[in-house]
UniProtKB/Swiss-Prot annotation:
Protein name: Olfactory receptor 2T8
UniProt cross-references to Pfam families, sorted A to Z: 7tm_4 (PF13853)
MF annotations from Gene Ontology: G protein-coupled receptor activity; olfactory receptor activity
Compartment list: Cell membrane
Iron-sulfur is among the record's keywords: no
Encoding gene, per UniProt annotation: OR2T8
Entry's Gene Ontology cellular component terms: plasma membrane
Amino acid sequence: MENGSYTSYFILLGLFNHTRAHQVLFMMVLSIVLTSLFGNSLMILLIHWDHRLHTPMYFLLSQLSLMDVMLVSTTVPKMAADYLTGSKAISRAGCGAQIFFLPTLGGGECFLLAAMAYDRYAAVCHPLRYPTLMSWQLCLRMNLSCWLLGAADGLLQAVATLSFPYCGAHEIDHFFCETPVLVRLACADTSVFENAMYICCVLMLLVPFSLILSSYGLILAAVLHMRSTEARKKAFATCSSHVAVVGLFYGAAIFTYMRPKSHRSTNHDKVVSAFYTMFTPLLNPLIYSVKNSEVKGALTRCMGRCVALSRE
């Protein structure tokens, strides 16, 4: 089962203890997570159900919601089960699965947000050429590329992280298996891997982020040249939701993966990880539904149809 360097399981110390205050926090977090799962699932169903939302923009938004549902499902069920049962062990395979899915979904979301920025650029700056610049074929290719690039990063991180010897070190002071936290337990020189991971994070975060900034710089210039006040308002309303989501996601991701090692602390890692795995997925459907009249219209039509069916 185990020798001096092989560890068949790990112990996740978790996010909460069993004090009264932490029990209340746990219930609040659980409520937020359930709301997040409901909101993102509803967004996916609305986009699939309402033909008015069958456009590249909303297809990409449905993929963002799918990634958020999977991201929450990767970490929270295990955390909740551990807290309620007191069993904190996670197998090596289970830990590897979490390490794989988190970069897959997080990295995929980086590229997906860049694809969504390009979609808004094409719609605002070149509305007449939009069907050509953002064809369904291109949209599907970009979406597939986002998933594949994220999966490649996740696979590399999972294989490399679990290849290190851990010399019987079991306890992970976190609520899920995350590469930067787990690598600290390794009883081998991980500097080459950490440097490679840092470079990879720079590429996966800053390259898409630069594309997003460039897209919105061009969008802003185009909006300022619009003569119609109504057109300006519509363009700002369409893009402001995406800008808010980008700010939340990239802020948390850059803080987590691009801080110098000397500035890292376990408590900060837990808080930031909780933010981008639990709270950001909740905010995405709220931001897009509140700011978007088409989504609100689809929700109203869906509720009306449900009421009509219930009366039959």
